[in-house]
Amino acid sequence: MRRLSTLLCAAMLMLTAGTPAAHAAAPWFASSVGAATQVISVVGVGGSSAKMDVYQRTGAGWQPIGAGIPAFIGANGMAPQTHDGQMKTPMGVFTLDFAFGTEPNPGGGLPYVQVGPDHWWDGDMKSPTYNTMQVCKKEQCRFNTSLSAGTENLDIPQYRHAVVMGVNKARVPGNGGAFFVHSTDGGPTAGCVAIDDGTLVGIMRWLRPGALIAISK
């Protein structure tokens, strides 16, 4: 994957520098992303596998700057509407709100939080902070920190680097939470999108506020 990451970074640099590009056919998500200029496309290819394409909008239209990136999705595939515990990746267009990871900030335009053992993603459906990042000592947290309750401790290898997807922003209990683009461990996810860490870092350095992710079968 190192060569793919290098090519992705090179393509991003060329577009940033204003290199002329040929007009390309509009991608599948074009009518659903408003005025966004950066979109990560994820399309399922069967089971828990998908391909990711990275697009930049330029004066010549949408330009793919990273294509055919192998990705893992939920162990049970995708669904238009997901619920806690389904192990499915939500379909639709979502914001990319901020980034986090156990590693130091690799750079980029999104806010970044370096996480440790006191960082959690609250999945407790009875908690007023459901579907948000929380920082607390386990014994002092005001929500159920158990994995069986849906809460995740963020100090794990898969979250070496991650970007938060704006799924269920209304934080409706049961409608799912903790959906990220994160580093892969080589297998299906609980509903997130996972890719090679080096490639993810290249994408994170390119991302700016207003970027979107579009997910479809």
Q: What do the predicted segments below correspond to?
A:
Residues 1-24:
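Secretory targeting and sorting signals
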Residues 24-189, 200-212, 217:
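Cell wall/extracellular polymer interaction/catalysis modules
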